[in-house]
Amino acid sequence: MTTLKFRNNDKISAKVFILGSTEDINKIGLDQNEADYVKKSYDDDKKKTVVINRYTECFHIFFIDTTEDENKFMEQCRKKGASICKWLNTNKYEEVLIQNIGGKRCVKMGTAEGMMLANYEFKKYKTDAKANSLKTIYFLEGTACEDCVEKLNITVEATLMARDLVNEPVNQLNAEKLAEFISEKVRSVGGEAEIFNKKKIEALKMGGLLAVNAGSIDEPTFTILEWKPENPVNEKPIVLVGKGIVFDTGGYNLKTSNFMNDMKDDMSGAATVACTVYAVAKAKLPLHVIALVPATDNRIDGNARVCGDIITMYDGTTVEVLNTDAEGRLILADALAYAKKYSPMMVFDFATLTGAASRAIGPVATVAMEHNAEEIYKQLEAVGERVYERLVKFPLYEEYGEMIKSDLADIQNIGGAYGGASTAGKFLEHFTDYPWVHFDIAGTAFLEKAEAYKPAGGVGIHVRLLMRFFRDMVKKD
């Protein structure tokens, strides 16, 4: 991981200068020819990054208009950081110094964040892989608060950890290994963890998790991760629930190969919530936060559930299973019902749940829904705009509840041909009685190709959003 640090001098060969206007050009040590070149480049294209490549050092110079919408110019800084990171690695630089000349300090943080996120790579299974050269990003001492730098390092570390988990294939990370890894990580920073094995899950009668696991050669797990500091600002805990389908074949509603190839990503929700608790604990935030991670793969054998089976969930609800590929909601339902025992302040669930959500808005935003949490959702939405992990609210109309009524059981696990994201949300809502927000990350958790600071593969989506949301909660107290 690339780390962000302070240094007491600018004697370094690679520098990034962020300028607020052309008046700042003469403040960065350029000779007249270089300054004229930068000015002409700016006049030709105000969004261009100008590279001054000397024999012993290089400068990357770009301009940010901080009079624009802050969310947009911060995203511009992240993208600039990502592109500069690529150049630095291509040219084998190991360190870089970022300075903002005029304007707001936050542009420097955004640029560093973009570099750190863009420098991610997952090459552990390549026998001849060479790591990226960039190792350290520097600010000059006194030009940013130490706390802000520490926050960014922790948040990026957790985001990259989530990416790693999503990118691991199931033969390396089954449900048991996932549970062990996230438990060890949370304990390493002072949190607590408990893993329920199959016997315990059977005793709790978590029928959804057991039904999905019926065709697997590996046992399911249900992991509880907790960070409970002394005197937390929240009297009731915040509970995060993450879908942990470590691989999804679709069951007897078998996926075709083009839809199955990336189904190691079906535990992205689990990665998000587990790595967020890790970050909260490492940052020692005064918040009581719990993550619930039901985990299994969804495979086929002679014991696997088939269409038409009726199962009984943790809370006693009976469910007619009409599609074995709508399995994520079954394991989430048990976890959401289990969350009631904590009398939570709020509950958020994260799941690569429906193709309908992905098809509706693609990879540029996450579909979200809420029940009895309108103000909380508005805060999350605003934070999503700030970190550019945007949310689009879908409805939970009562008519969607009619679509999942069953003639043979209390409810069924799919609706009709339309409104698939909302009928899935309505199914989950049945198991809640607290302020709840549902995040369907099917379109945002895993990318086919890299986009600026987001890599191809696992994105680690919404760790950044949650950490900003939680820090805002602490500030308001």
Where does each model-flagged region fall?
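Short amphipathic alpha-helical segment within the helicase RecA-like ATPase core
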Residues: 1-244
